[in-house]
Every structure is written in C-alpha cells, then in structure tokens.
Amino acid sequence: IAKNVIYQNSNTIFKRFDWLRRNEEKTNLNSHNIKLNINNPILASLKNKLENSLNSNLTNSLEYTQASLKDKNPFKNIRNWSHWSHGDISFGRVGEKGFVKPKDIRTRGIMFGADKLINNKIFGLAFRYGNDDVKIDNGTGSKLDAQAYTLNMYGSLPLDGKSNLNSLIGASFLSIDQLIKNTITGERYGRQIFASIIYENENEYTRHNLTPFGKFEIGITQLSEYTDFGTSATNSVDVHERLTFKTGNISGGLKFDDILYLDEKTLSRNGFVEYIFDLTPDIDHFYKNYHDNTSVRKTIKKHSL
C-alpha cells in the first residue's frame, strides 16, 4: 500500500508533464481524464472503449476556462492557471506463486491539480484521494481497506538543449483498517513523505521520436502502533509496534511520441518502456501477544509494502 500511494501520485503527475509538452501550442491546457488499469487480459480488451466514452462525456459536461501556458511573453500569463483532474481505477490479482496466497487488489483514486508557467518553468500543486482494497485469499476473509490523502508540489525545469528535469515532493496521511469477515479487527494510521525526480532528453532519436529518461524515487512511511483484536474464534490479541521504513526505486527507459497522418486525420501514438529496480529492503517489525506478552519478529517482504 505504501509504495502504491507513491506510485499513483508520481505516475499521474509525470503524465501531466508529458501531456503539457504534447499540447504546448494549444491555448487551452485544461485536462480532465479517467484511466482504467485492469490486470485481466479479457477485460483489458474492453477498457479503451470505456475510457474514451467516459472521457468524452466528462469533456462535454465541463465548461473550460482559457488559461494559456504558451505565450510569447511569459510574464503576461504569470497569473493564469491551468486546471486538470485525473480519475483512475485499477483492479487485478497479484502474488499467486507456489504456496503464497494471491491478493485481489482494487484501487480507486481522483486527483485535482493546477499549474502555470513562470519564466518557462512549470510549477503546480495537486491533491489526490485514493482508496485501496486488498483481499487476501487465505480462507479467513482477511481484508485491508486503506484511505490515502496526498498533497503534491511539482515543477519542471528546462535544461540546456532539449532536456528537462521534472520533480515532485508529496506528503500523505494514511488510514488503514484491517477486517476479517467484514468486521474491523484493527485500525492503523500513518504518514508519509516522498520525492521523485526524472530526467528526460528530448533530442529526437529515430523517426518515432524516442526519448530516453531516468527516474529516482524515495519515500519514508511511518505507521502507528495498533492492536489486532482478531475475532472471537481466534481469541487472540496482538499489539503491533510503531513501524518506520523507507521505500525507493531507480528506473530507466524510453518514451515514444509519434504522429501518424491518415488522409485528413491524424493519429497520435505515445507510450513508454521502463525497467524498474526496487531498492526497498525487507522490513522487520515486532508485535506482542496480549495474553503471554511474548515478543514476535515478523519480516515483511519488499513487494508487500
């Protein structure tokens, strides 16, 4: 959950940078989108049609205000802001390997942001609310229900030539409920700070306009102490200590952005290929059983954070 909160925020904001550069000649830089991520090959084939329908209806229902970030005189529009929003829904199953029980994950989020151009530099603020439901298929009906409220500050700095340095810092408040058969057995709160930076070289490589990039991301999360009351059937009460841990990754890849001309129409093709190396270590945490006061150490694998 901790890493997913960081990923959802940074991924959405960095896509905003890409969108701004693809549309920098437009006078209207407002944007409102809905994104679906489905880890199911059958359902994934239907998502594009649904996304287009939702985005079309959303666009038609909104009355845009002109707020240009592209002008010959950058000081003229120094007070103008472009506003944007992004909704995302993700669901799928992960972690099914050998004797490891799979997890069904459903993530929903909405982000609202505003940005403007100051002396050819982009500055913006964005707020995201996210809800993560994680169901563990272990026969007990275990589930985690997490709420995340995140404030982001982001910016883009043009470097020499056609290179850009995009960065963001964010702070989150987390609320996590542990449930067994829809009964809350534990409540935990957390806070989180994180930063992400990406370097892009926009010199054109090949006719598909390939753009190499490198990214570094780091976060610190602190979870409060909490008591797991279990159920009447388990008759077990465990007190978990406060937990502070770091997460991070380094990645690199290629983006492509190409326009295909078809008679009187144009088709914009863009995407990216990325390799991510996870720097997060396994985390040890301790808890005590209320009845015998025995301290137990448990290791959380990095892919579970």
Predicted segments with their positions:
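Membrane translocator/pore-forming domains, dominated by Gram-negative outer-membrane beta-barrels
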Residues: 1-24, 32, 77-305
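Outer-membrane beta-barrel biogenesis signature
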Residues: 8, 22-81
